[in-house]
Curated annotation (Swiss-Prot):
Its EC number is 6.1.1.4. One of its GO terms (biological process) is leucyl-tRNA aminoacylation. It comes from Renibacterium salmoninarum (strain ATCC 33209 / DSM 20767 / JCM 11484 / NBRC 15589 / NCIMB 2235). It is an enzyme of class 6 (ligase). A motif ('KMSKS' region) lies at residues 627-631. One of its GO terms (cellular component) is cytosol. HAMAP family: Leu_tRNA_synth_B. Signal peptide: none annotated. This is Leucine--tRNA ligase. Residues 1-31 are annotated as: Disordered. The gene is leuS.
Amino acid sequence: MVQSRGFSLSSVRNGTEGNTMSQHTSQPAADVPVDVADENRYDIAAIEAKWLPRWEEANIFAPLDDGSKERRYVCDMFPYPSGDLHMGHAEAFVMGDVVGRYWKLKGFDVLHPVGWDSFGLPAENAAIKRNAHPAEWTYANIETQAASFKRYAIGVDWSRRLQTSDPEYYRWTQWLFLRFYERGLAYRKNSPVNWCPKDLTVLANEQVINGACERCGTPVTKKNLNQWYFKITDYADRLLDDMAQLEGHWPERVLAMQRNWIGRSQGAHVDFVIDGMSDAETGEAKKVTVFTTRPDTLYGATFFAVAVDAALADELVTEEQRAELSAYQERVKHLSDIERQESDREKTGVFLGRYAINPIDGEMLPIWAADYVLADYGTGAIMAVPAHDQRDLDFARAFDLPVRQVLDTGAENPAETGTAAIGDGVLVNSGELDGLAKAEAIPAAISLLSKIGTGEATTNYRLRDWLLSRQRFWGAPVPIIHCAECGEVPVPDDQLPVRLPENLRGEQLAPKGTSPLASVADWVNVDCPKCGGAATRDTDTIDTFVDSSWYYLRYTSPEYTDGPFDPAAATRWMGVDQYVGGVEHAILHLLYSRFFVKVLNDLGLLEAKEPFKALLNQGQVLNGGKAMSKSLGNGVDLSQQLDRFGVDAVRLTMVFASPPEDDVDWADVSPSGSAKFLARAWRLAQDVTSEIGVDPATGDRALRSVTHRTLSEAADLIDAHKFNVVVAKTMELVNITRKSIDSGCGPADPAVREAVEAVAVILSLFAPYTAEDIWAELGHQDFVARASWPTVDDSLLVQSTITAVVQVQGKVRDRLEVPTDITEDQLRELALASEIVQKTLDGRGIRTVIVRAPKLVNIVPA
């Protein structure tokens, strides 16, 4: 049985993406499990109904943008409108909201915008299923989500709202494509691409997860197509080197993932002459270049391998071996890159009938086509050194190829053990390199290759150019026209946007392997802008990751009509001070956005060189230890949670359950506990009797000290994103304030008003409806979101008293305010004199008393 987590300090532990939500309901909370009698009519439904329309009318989160305050920009990864908001959204968006509200209270001019990533395949599939146009489903969902955003009290500037499927947005997506095209960064080429046989569209390398389509899970195949690419590889070094600016501000896990994806490695290009073959263009001896990080092991190369799906394999194969190669290619074409590189998989290959000549010793190396070699790594060909590479060794043993050890690592002979000798060692069987260690041998080998003109030092990258083309409808059309006379012709800027036709719907959008746009003759057939002759539009649409690579720039000036964004506005706001979103976007979206900003910087459109100064990855919302899903039947409906417990209780639970980066298991939290705590906090304001504006300096010093310590610690904790600890400390302040009202300094003491105002300000970050009502009850005329974070009096931070916990047999029975310098004997005496302790003991004797002055006493009865 899973035990619900209550709201004790012990429950503060180390919080996203949930799943599933039914259609939005705008009903207020109807079943809040709060003891209404005890908490004096805390009615969260009425409170929500009171404040939501007032907030909407005031648009209190629109920035001034007049230079009167220092600017801060907080941005959430915008949602895809696939339905209503779900539990994952609830956790993710509250994190950015906490940051934005806090910065506003601290006096910054805060930009916190909202929008939708509204192009994409789900809308197209929904339109096919519903016999509709994708826009109908998309914009209906956007309106539903927008209503939920407002109800959920996310403090954003609604005047900056955008959707990437709006023509006035994708006009600028197309405009940016053309600027990349002019710079040589957008180009088209024929190449093997990842192909999803279910969605019938191509996928970027980053969209293939463990050999399957990231969206539908179908195993991905390879297909030769003429496709559009962005030349992101031109920026590989800058993308890698500029990560130094992000150290300490981005999660190290994300930086490591990007470093690995870019995959920079130092080594050498080595030229191998193909025996008996001439270059078709030059007539000279045919050469094939390979990349290796270990040129020092050249003497150990015993065969040459080419990727089975590389064009090079078809070029090198002899006519006698061509049929065998074709049959092999057919057998392996359905294997993913991941499967092909699995270490425990049987190695397969075909001899191509030719030999490559080792440039360092003239040895003839048989050339094989192999599926463990990838076409898009290096040049698609490798020199195989089986003694010192396990996959090469497995292949050599499978086809009875020689194994020659050239590195003495102290390990047994790989030819006998079947285990490659890897790592550092001393070169052997390597001619003039004998006796050299790896660090000396690598540059020596490169020097030798350079002298004989067959190699040079180089850098290789795992990163490949970004595949942009999609053979689907619901995306921005590629703004290129194809003319038989002029070739590729960019659509003139004054003809942008190239709008999507509005007459396609339902089955007309069904995937056929070519874009549905190709079927609309009056859209496809146009005059060439250059020569006026008959021409056709490009029928592919642009990868939706392009839309999301620059939306945060559009937020800075969404009404700007002279470009994708106003350069002056972007200069004022960029880069984003706090970006919030899931770690699943570490490579795709985040890497692409970094690439875009660097190109725009080079184009002179943007001063920023990085899009996001700081990144916060929230965790996942689980249920019963598993991700929520329809198949598991463990989904939690967000709207039902909001109706039952109230918005504030759900928000507070999300924040209190764990630090933002950790997962939240909804089966193990207590939104009802959150609601009860909020009712207690709300009740405080009903009991304050001092007038607004009273000088708190005349109030109870002990309570004031707790209030100011809470404010001081909360500020540091919020900066560190330890929101759950802030909530815990606010709970302590509420409890201490209640005790002060009931049995301490009393409700009229100015320190009580100060404490309750502090509670309202802090709670406005997490539970804005309740905080707003507390603030108004205290007599304030303006919204609490427009208040200021209270100034901390440092003189009150020096503790003269502390709360000592008194336990009886390990259970807390009383709390005592005691001097910080109290002795153990004094604390023991006070604890034993407590009326609550005496009542608990009920005449029993005492076995022992454990004292840890000034914080703890534990009494063990006899």
